[in-house]
C-alpha cells in the first residue's frame, strides 16, 4: 500500500498505480461480472506479458517444446462461453473442469488444490543461511540509495520471527538489488 511504500522507499513519488495499467481492460469488459473482468485483465496483462512469456523462455532455454492445451483456440472459445457460476463460487474454483475431470480421474485428484510450480522462497527467507544473503544486500550502498535500510531489516526480522509474512516484498526488493548490482554497480 502507499503507506508501506513511503515507509520503505527514499524519495517516494507516486507515479502510475497498478490500477492505471489495468483500468483499460476493466473498461473493455465493463458491464460484465467481476470474474469476467478479472479474466480479461489476466488475459491481457498477466498471461501474455508474464506467465506465458516466462514459460516460453524457460522451455526454449532447455530445448523443450511447450504446449499449453487450455489455450488451444477451440478449447479457449468453448471456455469463454461457460457461465461464471460454472467456473467459480465462494468455495471452489474450476467447477466445470473439475466436474469433467472427475469422470475420468479420482475425485481426490480432480479436487486437489492448484499447486503451480512453487518455489519455497517463504521458507528460504526464514533460514539464516539465505536470510543472511538478503540481509547483506539490504545493507549495501545500493540499498541505502533507494530504501530506508532500517525498515528493510525490520521487515526481514519480522519475517524470520514469523510475526509477519513479508516474503513477497522481501523477495522483490532483493531481486531488484541483485539486478541493480549486476547492471549498474558491476558495470
Q: Positions of the model-derived regions?
A:
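Adenosyl-5′-phosphate
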Residues: 1-187
